[in-house]
From Swiss-Prot:
This is Uperin-3.3. Pfam families: Antimicrobial_8. It comes from the Eukaryota. It is found in: Secreted. The keyword Zinc does not apply.
């Protein structure tokens, strides 16, 4: 769902930072 996609993006951002 949209929430899962948001969580996935958030995780990627954290990994990049």
């Amino acid at each position: 769902g949209v929430l899962d996609a948001f969580k996935k993006i958030a995780t990627v951002v954290k990994n990049l930072v």
